C-alpha cells in the first residue's frame, strides 16, 4: 500500500509555497506532540499524527517519511497526481477530512471547521 501514499516531500517538488506554509502549522509538528508525552506509538493516538498508519507503514522503523499530518491527510489519496496533475486534480478539502481526527472522541478541543481551517489551509494555487 505504500505506493498509494504521497508524502509532503513529493508534494513539495511542485507546491513550494504551500509546503512552506504547511511547515509553519501545527500539522507539520503533529508527531512531535506525541513524542513530548511519550505517546508516539499508542495505537489510539498515532493514526491522527502521521500519514497512512496501518497501510503505508505499521512498524516504527518505517515511520519517518510518514510522520506528521501531511497533504494527503487533508486532501485524500491521489497517487496519479504527480505524473498527470491535469487528469488527477485534488478537490477542495472537506470538513469530513478534518473530523476524522478533530472530533469529540479524539480531541478535547472544540473543533469548528470554519474557524480552524484557516490556520492550516495552504495558500491557493496560482493557475495559468
Where are these regions (language model features)?
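Short sequence/structural segments immediately N-terminal
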Residues: 1-128
